[in-house]
Amino acid sequence: MQVSGNDSSKKRSAIKFVKLLSALILAILIPLISFVVYETHSHVGEIKQLLSIGSDNGKQILGFKGQQRYLLAFQNSAEARGTGGLIGAYAIVRIDHGRISIEQSGSNIDLINRQVLPLSMPADFVKLYGNDPAMWLNSNLSPHFPNAALIWMKLWQMQGGKKLDGVMAIDPTVVSYILRTVGPIQSADGDLVTADNVVKLTLSDMYVKYETNNLERKKALVDLLTKVFAKVQASSSVQKLHIMKALLEPYKEHRILFYSTNTKTQAAVAKTQLGGVLSRTAPNEYRAVVENVDGNKMDYYLDREIKIQDLSCSPD
Protein backbone atom coordinates (compact mmCIF):
# COMPACT_ATOMS: atom_id res chain seq x y z
CA MET A 1 0.00 0.00 0.00
CA GLN A 2 1.50 3.32 -1.10
CA VAL A 3 0.67 6.42 0.91
CA SER A 4 1.09 9.73 -0.93
CA GLY A 5 0.31 13.31 -0.06
CA ASN A 6 -1.97 13.53 -3.09
CA ASP A 7 -4.10 10.55 -2.14
CA SER A 8 -6.12 11.67 0.87
CA SER A 9 -8.12 8.44 1.05
CA LYS A 10 -5.02 6.28 1.39
CA LYS A 11 -3.52 8.75 3.82
CA ARG A 12 -6.58 8.54 6.07
CA SER A 13 -6.42 4.75 5.91
CA ALA A 14 -2.77 4.79 6.92
CA ILE A 15 -3.49 7.05 9.89
CA LYS A 16 -6.33 4.77 11.00
CA PHE A 17 -4.05 1.78 10.62
CA VAL A 18 -1.33 3.24 12.86
CA LYS A 19 -3.88 4.11 15.53
CA LEU A 20 -5.35 0.64 15.44
CA LEU A 21 -2.03 -1.17 15.29
CA SER A 22 -0.86 0.67 18.39
CA ALA A 23 -4.12 -0.31 20.09
CA LEU A 24 -4.06 -3.98 19.16
CA ILE A 25 -0.41 -5.02 18.98
CA LEU A 26 1.34 -2.48 21.17
CA ALA A 27 -1.29 -1.81 23.80
CA ILE A 28 0.74 -3.85 26.26
CA LEU A 29 4.04 -2.32 25.21
CA ILE A 30 3.67 1.40 24.47
CA PRO A 31 1.17 4.28 24.71
CA LEU A 32 -1.14 5.05 21.82
CA ILE A 33 0.39 7.29 19.13
CA SER A 34 -2.29 9.58 17.81
CA PHE A 35 -1.43 10.71 14.30
CA VAL A 36 1.27 9.17 12.14
CA VAL A 37 1.45 8.47 8.43
CA TYR A 38 3.45 5.46 7.34
CA GLU A 39 4.16 3.58 4.11
CA THR A 40 4.36 -0.15 3.61
CA HIS A 41 4.58 -2.35 0.53
CA SER A 42 4.48 -5.91 1.85
CA HIS A 43 1.73 -6.04 4.48
CA VAL A 44 -1.46 -4.96 2.72
CA GLY A 45 -3.36 -8.05 3.88
CA GLU A 46 -2.34 -7.61 7.51
CA ILE A 47 -3.32 -3.93 7.42
CA LYS A 48 -6.77 -4.76 6.03
CA GLN A 49 -7.25 -7.38 8.76
CA LEU A 50 -6.40 -4.97 11.54
CA LEU A 51 -8.50 -2.16 10.09
CA SER A 52 -11.48 -4.51 10.07
CA ILE A 53 -11.46 -4.63 13.87
CA GLY A 54 -12.43 -0.98 14.13
CA SER A 55 -11.31 1.96 16.25
CA ASP A 56 -14.15 1.47 18.75
CA ASN A 57 -12.73 -1.90 19.76
CA GLY A 58 -9.26 -0.38 19.85
CA LYS A 59 -10.50 2.11 22.44
CA GLN A 60 -11.95 -0.78 24.45
CA ILE A 61 -8.59 -2.58 24.45
CA LEU A 62 -6.70 0.56 25.46
CA GLY A 63 -8.91 1.28 28.45
CA PHE A 64 -10.70 4.37 27.13
CA LYS A 65 -14.01 2.70 28.01
CA GLY A 66 -12.92 1.52 31.40
CA GLN A 67 -9.69 0.23 32.92
CA GLN A 68 -8.44 -3.02 31.40
CA ARG A 69 -6.23 -5.70 32.93
CA TYR A 70 -4.42 -8.27 30.77
CA LEU A 71 -2.23 -11.30 31.23
CA LEU A 72 0.84 -10.98 28.99
CA ALA A 73 2.25 -14.47 28.38
CA PHE A 74 5.80 -14.96 27.15
CA GLN A 75 5.79 -18.23 25.21
CA ASN A 76 8.99 -20.28 25.34
CA SER A 77 9.24 -21.79 21.87
CA ALA A 78 12.12 -24.05 22.95
CA GLU A 79 9.31 -26.39 24.03
CA ALA A 80 6.50 -26.31 21.49
CA ARG A 81 2.85 -26.04 22.40
CA GLY A 82 -0.23 -25.59 20.26
CA THR A 83 -0.15 -21.79 20.40
CA GLY A 84 3.64 -21.54 20.09
CA GLY A 85 5.40 -22.54 23.28
CA LEU A 86 4.92 -23.13 26.99
CA ILE A 87 4.56 -20.12 29.27
CA GLY A 88 8.02 -19.18 30.51
CA ALA A 89 7.20 -15.82 32.07
CA TYR A 90 4.20 -13.55 32.50
CA ALA A 91 3.13 -10.04 33.44
CA ILE A 92 -0.16 -8.56 34.59
CA VAL A 93 -0.61 -5.30 32.72
CA ARG A 94 -3.12 -2.56 33.52
CA ILE A 95 -4.19 -0.05 30.86
CA ASP A 96 -6.23 3.01 31.79
CA HIS A 97 -6.94 5.61 29.09
CA GLY A 98 -3.82 4.50 27.24
CA ARG A 99 -1.60 4.68 30.33
CA ILE A 100 0.17 1.37 30.83
CA SER A 101 1.62 -0.10 34.01
CA ILE A 102 2.83 -3.52 35.10
CA GLU A 103 1.11 -4.68 38.29
CA GLN A 104 3.00 -7.93 38.63
CA SER A 105 5.47 -10.11 36.73
CA GLY A 106 7.12 -13.45 37.30
CA SER A 107 8.09 -16.82 35.87
CA ASN A 108 6.00 -19.96 35.54
CA ILE A 109 7.27 -21.10 38.94
CA ASP A 110 4.79 -18.60 40.46
CA LEU A 111 1.82 -20.17 38.69
CA ILE A 112 -0.25 -22.77 40.56
CA ASN A 113 -1.22 -25.98 38.78
CA ARG A 114 -4.51 -27.85 39.22
CA GLN A 115 -5.46 -31.52 38.99
CA VAL A 116 -8.55 -31.08 36.83
CA LEU A 117 -9.58 -28.59 34.17
CA PRO A 118 -10.55 -25.30 35.85
CA LEU A 119 -13.59 -24.80 33.62
CA SER A 120 -15.91 -26.72 31.33
CA MET A 121 -14.41 -27.28 27.87
CA PRO A 122 -15.90 -28.77 24.66
CA ALA A 123 -16.09 -32.57 24.44
CA ASP A 124 -13.57 -32.77 21.58
CA PHE A 125 -11.09 -30.75 23.65
CA VAL A 126 -11.46 -33.08 26.65
CA LYS A 127 -11.14 -36.14 24.42
CA LEU A 128 -7.84 -34.89 23.00
CA TYR A 129 -6.20 -33.36 26.07
CA GLY A 130 -7.98 -34.66 29.16
CA ASN A 131 -6.97 -32.79 32.33
CA ASP A 132 -3.40 -32.07 31.18
CA PRO A 133 -4.22 -28.38 30.46
CA ALA A 134 -4.96 -27.92 34.18
CA MET A 135 -1.17 -27.52 34.48
CA TRP A 136 0.17 -24.18 33.29
CA LEU A 137 2.94 -25.85 31.28
CA ASN A 138 0.32 -27.79 29.31
CA SER A 139 -2.43 -25.21 29.38
CA ASN A 140 -1.97 -24.24 25.73
CA LEU A 141 -1.78 -27.67 24.09
CA SER A 142 -4.72 -26.66 21.89
CA PRO A 143 -3.71 -24.52 18.88
CA HIS A 144 -7.01 -22.63 19.21
CA PHE A 145 -5.81 -19.58 21.18
CA PRO A 146 -9.16 -18.76 22.85
CA ASN A 147 -8.97 -22.16 24.58
CA ALA A 148 -5.61 -21.27 26.10
CA ALA A 149 -6.75 -17.77 27.01
CA LEU A 150 -9.85 -19.00 28.85
CA ILE A 151 -7.83 -21.58 30.80
CA TRP A 152 -5.13 -19.05 31.68
CA MET A 153 -7.63 -16.51 32.95
CA LYS A 154 -9.47 -19.09 35.06
CA LEU A 155 -6.24 -20.54 36.51
CA TRP A 156 -5.09 -17.02 37.36
CA GLN A 157 -8.37 -16.21 39.09
CA MET A 158 -8.24 -19.48 41.07
CA GLN A 159 -4.87 -18.57 42.55
CA GLY A 160 -6.22 -15.27 43.80
CA GLY A 161 -5.41 -13.03 40.87
CA LYS A 162 -7.61 -10.09 39.95
CA LYS A 163 -10.21 -10.50 37.20
CA LEU A 164 -8.69 -10.22 33.73
CA ASP A 165 -10.12 -8.53 30.65
CA GLY A 166 -8.01 -10.47 28.19
CA VAL A 167 -4.76 -12.15 27.29
CA MET A 168 -1.87 -11.39 24.97
CA ALA A 169 0.93 -13.79 24.01
CA ILE A 170 4.33 -13.09 22.45
CA ASP A 171 7.59 -15.04 22.03
CA PRO A 172 11.37 -14.33 21.89
CA THR A 173 11.24 -13.52 18.19
CA VAL A 174 8.81 -10.67 18.91
CA VAL A 175 11.31 -9.33 21.44
CA SER A 176 14.06 -9.48 18.80
CA TYR A 177 12.02 -7.23 16.49
CA ILE A 178 11.53 -4.76 19.33
CA LEU A 179 15.24 -4.70 20.22
CA ARG A 180 16.12 -4.12 16.58
CA THR A 181 14.33 -0.80 16.92
CA VAL A 182 15.04 0.37 20.48
CA GLY A 183 18.57 -1.00 20.73
CA PRO A 184 20.25 -3.49 23.09
CA ILE A 185 19.78 -3.90 26.83
CA GLN A 186 22.13 -5.22 29.49
CA SER A 187 21.19 -8.42 31.28
CA ALA A 188 21.38 -8.82 35.05
CA ASP A 189 24.80 -10.47 34.76
CA GLY A 190 26.20 -7.84 32.40
CA ASP A 191 25.70 -9.49 29.01
CA LEU A 192 24.62 -7.33 26.09
CA VAL A 193 21.25 -8.52 24.79
CA THR A 194 20.60 -7.57 21.17
CA ALA A 195 18.13 -8.32 18.41
CA ASP A 196 20.62 -10.80 16.99
CA ASN A 197 21.22 -12.84 20.14
CA VAL A 198 18.03 -12.60 22.24
CA VAL A 199 16.39 -15.69 20.70
CA LYS A 200 19.49 -17.85 21.15
CA LEU A 201 20.04 -16.41 24.62
CA THR A 202 16.54 -17.16 25.92
CA LEU A 203 16.02 -20.51 24.16
CA SER A 204 19.51 -22.01 24.42
CA ASP A 205 22.30 -20.11 26.18
CA MET A 206 20.40 -19.53 29.42
CA TYR A 207 19.81 -23.26 29.82
CA VAL A 208 23.56 -23.89 29.59
CA LYS A 209 24.54 -20.98 31.80
CA TYR A 210 22.04 -21.86 34.54
CA GLU A 211 22.18 -25.63 34.07
CA THR A 212 22.32 -26.29 37.80
CA ASN A 213 20.05 -23.43 38.89
CA ASN A 214 16.80 -23.27 36.94
CA LEU A 215 15.31 -20.76 39.36
CA GLU A 216 18.06 -18.25 38.55
CA ARG A 217 17.41 -18.78 34.84
CA LYS A 218 13.75 -17.93 35.33
CA LYS A 219 14.67 -14.81 37.32
CA ALA A 220 17.09 -13.74 34.58
CA LEU A 221 14.34 -14.15 31.98
CA VAL A 222 11.88 -12.01 33.93
CA ASP A 223 14.57 -9.35 34.45
CA LEU A 224 15.29 -9.29 30.72
CA LEU A 225 11.64 -8.85 29.75
CA THR A 226 11.14 -6.13 32.37
CA LYS A 227 14.08 -4.17 30.94
CA VAL A 228 12.75 -4.52 27.40
CA PHE A 229 9.37 -3.15 28.51
CA ALA A 230 11.06 -0.23 30.29
CA LYS A 231 13.12 0.61 27.21
CA VAL A 232 10.05 0.62 24.99
CA GLN A 233 8.24 2.88 27.44
CA ALA A 234 11.16 5.31 27.35
CA SER A 235 11.53 5.31 23.55
CA SER A 236 10.77 8.32 21.38
CA SER A 237 7.66 8.72 19.25
CA VAL A 238 9.71 8.02 16.13
CA GLN A 239 11.07 4.80 17.65
CA LYS A 240 7.56 3.72 18.61
CA LEU A 241 6.45 4.19 15.02
CA HIS A 242 9.31 1.97 13.87
CA ILE A 243 8.35 -0.64 16.48
CA MET A 244 4.85 -0.77 15.05
CA LYS A 245 6.25 -1.26 11.57
CA ALA A 246 8.64 -3.98 12.75
CA LEU A 247 5.91 -5.90 14.57
CA LEU A 248 3.98 -6.49 11.37
CA GLU A 249 6.34 -9.38 10.60
CA PRO A 250 5.77 -11.38 13.82
CA TYR A 251 2.06 -10.57 13.55
CA LYS A 252 2.04 -12.19 10.12
CA GLU A 253 3.90 -15.18 11.58
CA HIS A 254 1.21 -15.70 14.28
CA ARG A 255 3.68 -14.76 17.04
CA ILE A 256 1.40 -12.08 18.54
CA LEU A 257 -1.94 -13.35 19.82
CA PHE A 258 -4.77 -11.59 21.63
CA TYR A 259 -8.03 -12.51 23.35
CA SER A 260 -10.64 -10.17 24.85
CA THR A 261 -13.45 -10.98 27.27
CA ASN A 262 -15.47 -8.23 25.60
CA THR A 263 -17.81 -10.12 23.26
CA LYS A 264 -17.88 -7.47 20.54
CA THR A 265 -14.13 -6.92 20.58
CA GLN A 266 -13.38 -10.65 20.57
CA ALA A 267 -15.73 -11.26 17.64
CA ALA A 268 -13.76 -8.73 15.61
CA VAL A 269 -10.34 -9.96 16.76
CA ALA A 270 -11.28 -13.58 15.98
CA LYS A 271 -11.56 -12.71 12.28
CA THR A 272 -7.88 -11.75 12.15
CA GLN A 273 -4.58 -13.57 12.69
CA LEU A 274 -4.34 -11.76 16.01
CA GLY A 275 -7.09 -14.01 17.39
CA GLY A 276 -5.29 -17.31 16.76
CA VAL A 277 -8.64 -18.94 16.02
CA LEU A 278 -9.19 -22.33 14.37
CA SER A 279 -12.48 -21.82 12.56
CA ARG A 280 -15.13 -24.52 12.27
CA THR A 281 -16.79 -22.62 9.43
CA ALA A 282 -15.87 -23.26 5.79
CA PRO A 283 -13.74 -22.21 4.08
CA ASN A 284 -11.38 -22.98 6.95
CA GLU A 285 -7.90 -24.49 6.98
CA TYR A 286 -5.82 -27.53 7.77
CA ARG A 287 -2.99 -26.83 10.17
CA ALA A 288 0.08 -28.85 11.14
CA VAL A 289 0.62 -28.46 14.89
CA VAL A 290 3.83 -29.42 16.71
CA GLU A 291 3.72 -30.45 20.38
CA ASN A 292 6.80 -31.28 22.47
CA VAL A 293 5.63 -33.64 25.22
CA ASP A 294 9.10 -34.64 26.45
CA GLY A 295 9.91 -31.44 28.35
CA ASN A 296 13.36 -31.38 26.76
CA LYS A 297 13.56 -27.81 25.35
CA MET A 298 14.97 -29.20 22.10
CA ASP A 299 12.76 -27.37 19.60
CA TYR A 300 15.26 -24.53 19.22
CA TYR A 301 17.70 -26.98 17.64
CA LEU A 302 15.27 -28.65 15.23
CA ASP A 303 14.54 -27.88 11.60
CA ARG A 304 11.20 -29.11 10.31
CA GLU A 305 9.92 -29.71 6.83
CA ILE A 306 6.33 -30.66 6.06
CA LYS A 307 5.30 -32.06 2.69
CA ILE A 308 1.68 -32.71 1.76
CA GLN A 309 1.01 -34.88 -1.29
CA ASP A 310 -2.66 -35.62 -0.83
CA LEU A 311 -5.11 -34.47 1.80
CA SER A 312 -8.79 -35.16 2.27
CA CYS A 313 -11.29 -35.20 5.11
CA SER A 314 -14.40 -37.34 5.47
CA PRO A 315 -17.75 -35.69 6.36
CA ASP A 316 -17.67 -37.13 9.89
Report residues per predicted region.
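Non-catalytic, solvent-exposed segments at the cell envelope interface
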Residues: 2-316
